[in-house]
Amino acid sequence: MSALTIYSETETREPLWHSTDAAEIADKLNARGVRFERWEADRDLGQDPAAETVINAYQHAIDKLVAEKGYQSWDVISLRADNPQKEALRAKFLNEHTHGEDEVRFFVEGAGLFCLHIDDQVYQVLCEKNDLISVPAGTPHWFDMGSEPNFTAIRIFDNPEGWIAQFTGDAIADAYPRLP
């Protein structure tokens, strides 16, 4: 179940707000410029699907986003618990960073935790299958896929080169709850 938990930048143990209601989550995030929507991820992808299979199954969703925002490229990130690079990838994504473009993800399997550092608050968004999130360009954030990752998401980019991060050097991510 998707969830949003909001923390103060200075108080990492007691949430200011929490909800698992998709409409409430969307309202809170939209007020901060973050797009959050529930889409249908209803295609049977089989076990450990190839990127091409995922793209073909959800080309209609990609086309919708491209038509809306003029995105130039897309790919698929799919990680499972048996991935030999899971620890290195988790460590990389857990560092607070920004992008020069929106970070758009459509989760078609599994879950991951986007943590957005907006002003003096941290918004932890548990994204699951059927969730579309678009983090605005320049928003400091990090992503936690957990110690045993299990997700597939379509990534949509303005930049044809794909995922390019500018790391902030802030260790704030270390202070907040993570996925197990």
UniProtKB/Swiss-Prot annotation:
Its cofactor is Fe(2+); Ni(2+). Ni(2+) binds at residues 97, 99, 103, 141. The record marks 102 as: May play a role in transmitting local conformational changes. Keywords: Amino-acid biosynthesis, Dioxygenase, Iron, Metal-binding, Methionine biosynthesis, Nickel, Oxidoreductase. It catalyses: 1,2-dihydroxy-5-(methylsulfanyl)pent-1-en-3-one + O2 = 3-(methylsulfanyl)propanoate + CO + formate + 2 H(+); 1,2-dihydroxy-5-(methylsulfanyl)pent-1-en-3-one + O2 = 4-methylsulfanyl-2-oxobutanoate + formate + 2 H(+). One of its GO terms (biological process) is L-methionine salvage from S-adenosylmethionine. Disulfide bonds: none annotated. Binds 1 Fe(2+) cation per monomer. GO terms for molecular function: acireductone dioxygenase (Ni2+-requiring) activity; acireductone dioxygenase [iron(II)-requiring] activity; iron ion binding; nickel cation binding. The record marks 96 as: May play a role in metal incorporation in vivo. It is an enzyme of class 1 (oxidoreductase). InterPro entries: ARD, ARD_bac, RmlC-like_jellyroll, RmlC_Cupin_sf. The record marks 105 as: Important to generate the dianion. Pathway: Amino-acid biosynthesis; L-methionine biosynthesis via salvage pathway; L-methionine from S-methyl-5-thio-alpha-D-ribose 1-phosphate: step 5/6. Its EC number is 1.13.11.54, 1.13.11.53. Fe(2+) binds at residues 97, 99, 103, 141. It holds the Pfam family ARD. Catalyzes 2 different reactions between oxygen and the acireductone 1,2-dihydroxy-3-keto-5-methylthiopentene (DHK-MTPene) depending upon the metal bound in the active site. Fe-containing acireductone dioxygenase (Fe-ARD) produces formate and 2-keto-4-methylthiobutyrate (KMTB), the alpha-ketoacid precursor of methionine in the methionine recycle pathway. Ni-containing acireductone dioxygenase (Ni-ARD) produces methylthiopropionate, carbon monoxide and formate, and does not lie on the methionine recycle pathway. Belongs to the acireductone dioxygenase (ARD) family. Monomer. This is Acireductone dioxygenase. The lineage of its organism: Bacteria, Pseudomonadati, Pseudomonadota, Gammaproteobacteria, Enterobacterales. The gene is mtnD.
